[in-house]
């Protein structure tokens, strides 16, 4: 693991942009932050859309994310899992 891996973090703003780019779902970052414990379905993002986000992040960071990332139900859970994986390099 390199020191750079420790600096990787997906923000709410990045997640909002990924939702728009990979799934065509527009959610304002402020709203996403305020409702981070609401289900992805509340924002119109389905499991296929989440899979696209996971694939984009794996490509961006060059590592496989935990399988559970594809099954996260809320943005808060997703960001916690993904950022934990990026921090440890798993």
Curated annotation (Swiss-Prot):
Post-translational modification O-(pantetheine 4'-phosphoryl)serine, affected residues: 47
Post-translational modification, as annotated: 4'-phosphopantetheine is transferred from CoA to a specific serine of the apo-ACP-like protein.
Record's keyword terms, sorted: Phosphopantetheine, Phosphoprotein
Ranges where the Carrier domain occurs: 9-90
Pfam families reported in the protein's UniProt record: PP-binding
Gene3D superfamilies associated with the record: ACP-like
Record's function text: Involved in developmentally regulated synthesis of a compound biosynthetically related to polyketide antibiotics which is essential for spore color in Streptomyces coelicolor.
Protein name listed in UniProt: Probable acyl carrier protein
């Amino acid at each position: 693991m390199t020191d750079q891996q420790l600096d990787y973090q997906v923000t709410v703003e990045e997640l909002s942009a990924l939702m728009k780019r990979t799934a065509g779902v527009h959610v304002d970052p402020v709203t996403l932050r305020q409702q981070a414990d609401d289900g992805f379905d509340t924002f119109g993002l389905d499991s296929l859309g989440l899979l696209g986000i996971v694939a984009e992040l794996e490509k961006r960071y060059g590592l496989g994310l935990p399988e559970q990332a594809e099954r996260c139900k809320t943005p808060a859970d997703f960001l916690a899992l993904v950022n934990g994986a990026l921090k440890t390099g798993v």
